């Protein structure tokens, strides 16, 4: 059939020109497992399911790593979670004793805490005439019935011996307490009989982690033990032709002097250390806030990654009531981390914890602190700082002191990187004029595109760089774009004024007695 198809028309569809968002969050947990776990030593488990309890079979239900997964999932079932599992070394398990003295002369209740006031607290019913042997046996039985507890227990006469499930030093931070009073029971002392010793070899643990993790939870906190994760992240901070940076979170329990000593050897913009005070009382031994350090680190990493996840509901973690801040996204990188609500953490008993002066000194030295609000009914995070204090020449440097500064800067860079990658994926380069309908770039077009990205970052959807005419003019005046057509290279230098956080208000109130 002779069909006339004039004029000939062909219309191709092309993708819309849209900005590229920053990549979704991904968090890595590293921790010790038990022999009941199904995974092998040093293996990477990817994309742990948010539903059910896969961590129990994978890592052992009462393992350190399974507890970290549970704590993370309490606050964040959305973000992708991976884990590296480590077998115990040929080490020593920590042992703590609770010594019961006396025979009850009336019924009552003792409360035993074994590693977590929230998750592993046991009310022990004591009957009238119960002997110390009977009470000790009841305590051991209750602890052993908790399949997730980080201790197993055995009772001999009136002494309960708690043995840490995982060998090594991490369990030395776990708190054990015997609370309450029962007539006739004259003693319930807590003491450490054997400290945990010898941790897994950590040197090459992260070799299997080839993806980018914006957060890594690392239970070991001594200077030598954090070195592997610091080295791993340091090489990724300014990677070539990629965005691979992240931040590691760990925690430790010690005296104030010991904490300052530990921090002296640290200086990394990729490491956050949460510091809690070691309390030593007749009936209690452990951190002021009785929760495992590794669980606290996992909790915060979960909240941080949720904050940075687009459209995630985060209202319950904020004290701010600003409407657009109630949902996660890149803009939350600049919202202060201090006063983050940590309702999953226990309170702190009167007389325990850091003083205001100690908190200030720890913060200045590079430690972050978790505590409670002024009424004591909710956990809160204090200033979240990195251990970075000085530059390579040992000069004081505040550039990456606060985690907010690190996250803000990182998200700014990633936005520029992703959008440069997309916009100039297949572009010509010229010192001349642009040609309509052709993919060509010159200095002016690259400059204009960079300026547009800055304006995006200053808008309500990002709030990462300063907005307004003065800030934008500063950016434009300090933006330098140079072309080298021979090698197709564009060199861009920019000064980016970031949004920071309101941390201190000072003022003077002068009293007046007359308005005339």
Model regions and ranges:
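A short, well-structured beta->alpha microelement
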Residues: 10, 190-205, 254-257
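Bacterial flagellar/type III secretion structural subunits and associated motility module proteins
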Residues: 102, 106-117, 179-200
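Disulfide-bonded cysteine-rich modules in secreted/extracellular proteins
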Residues: 91-102, 199-205
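Extended, beta-strand-rich, solvent-exposed assembly scaffolds of outer structural proteins
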Residues: 49-59, 99-175, 231-238
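Extended Gly/Ser/Thr-rich low-complexity repeat segments
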Residues: 169-185, 295, 300, 508-510
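A glycine- and small-residue-enriched flexible loop/hinge signal that marks low-structured segments
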Residues: 141, 209-431
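Surface-exposed ligand/attachment interfaces on beta-rich extracellular proteins
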Residues: 126-130, 154-156, 195-206, 433-442
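Structured, hydrophobic secondary-structure cores that serve as assembly/anchoring elements
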Residues: 1-80, 344-516
């Amino acid at each position: 059939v002779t069909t006339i198809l004039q004029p000939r028309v062909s219309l191709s569809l092309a993708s819309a020109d849209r900005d590229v968002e920053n990549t979704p969050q991904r968090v890595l947990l590293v921790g010790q497992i038990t022999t009941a776990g199904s995974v092998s030593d040093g293996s990477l488990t990817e994309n742990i399911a948010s539903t059910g309890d896969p961590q129990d079979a994978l890592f052992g239900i009462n393992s350190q790593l399974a507890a970290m997964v549970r704590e993370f999932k309490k606050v964040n079932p959305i973000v992708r979670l991976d884990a590296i599992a480590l077998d115990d070394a040929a080490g020593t398990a920590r042992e703590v004793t609770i010594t019961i003295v006396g025979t009850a002369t009336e019924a009552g209740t003792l409360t035993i805490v074994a590693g977590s006031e929230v998750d592993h607290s046991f009310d022990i019913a004591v009957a009238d005439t119960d002997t110390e042997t009977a009470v000790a046996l009841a305590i051991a039985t209750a602890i052993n019935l908790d399949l997730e507890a980080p201790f197993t227990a055995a009772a001999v006469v009136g002494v309960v011996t708690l043995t840490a499930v995982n060998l090594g030093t991490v369990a030395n931070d776990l708190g054990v307490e015997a609370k309450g009073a029962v007539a006739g029971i004259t003693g319930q002392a807590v003491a450490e009989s054997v400290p945990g010793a010898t941790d897994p070899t950590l040197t090459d643990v992260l070799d299997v982690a080839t993806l980018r993790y914006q957060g890594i939870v690392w239970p070991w906190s001594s200077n030598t033990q954090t070195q592997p994760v610091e080295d791993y992240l340091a090489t990724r901070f300014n990677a070539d032709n990629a965005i691979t940076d992240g931040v590691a979170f760990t925690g430790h329990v010690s005296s104030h002097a010991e904490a300052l000593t530990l921090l002296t050897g640290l200086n990394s913009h990729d490491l956050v250390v949460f510091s809690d005070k070691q309390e030593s009382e007749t009936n209690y031994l452990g951190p002021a806030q009785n929760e495992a350090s590794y669980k606290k680190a996992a909790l915060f990493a979960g909240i941080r990654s949720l904050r940075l996840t687009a459209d995630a509901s985060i209202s319950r973690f904020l004290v701010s009531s600003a409407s657009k801040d109630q949902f996660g996204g890149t803009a939350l990188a600049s919202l202060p981390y201090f006063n983050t609500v940590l309702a999953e953490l226990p309170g702190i008993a009167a007389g325990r914890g850091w003083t205001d002066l100690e908190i200030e000194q720890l913060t200045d030295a590079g430690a972050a602190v978790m505590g409670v609000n002024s009424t004591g009914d909710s956990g809160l995070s204090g200033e979240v700082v990195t251990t970075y204090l000085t530059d390579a020449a040992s000069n004081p440097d505040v550039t990456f002191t606060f985690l907010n500064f690190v996250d803000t800067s990182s998200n700014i860079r990633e936005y520029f990187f992703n959008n440069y990658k997309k916009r100039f994926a297949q572009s010509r380069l010229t010192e001349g004029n642009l040609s309509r309908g052709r993919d060509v770039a010159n200095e002016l077009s690259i400059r204009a595109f960079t300026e547009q990205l800055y304006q995006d970052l200053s808008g309500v959807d990002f709030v990462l760089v300063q907005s307004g005419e003065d800030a934008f003019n500063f950016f434009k005046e300090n933006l330098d774009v140079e072309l080298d057509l021979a090698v197709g290279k564009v060199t861009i230098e920019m000064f980016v004024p970031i949004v920071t956080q309101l941390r201190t208000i000072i003022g003077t109130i002068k009293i007046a007695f007359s308005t005339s």
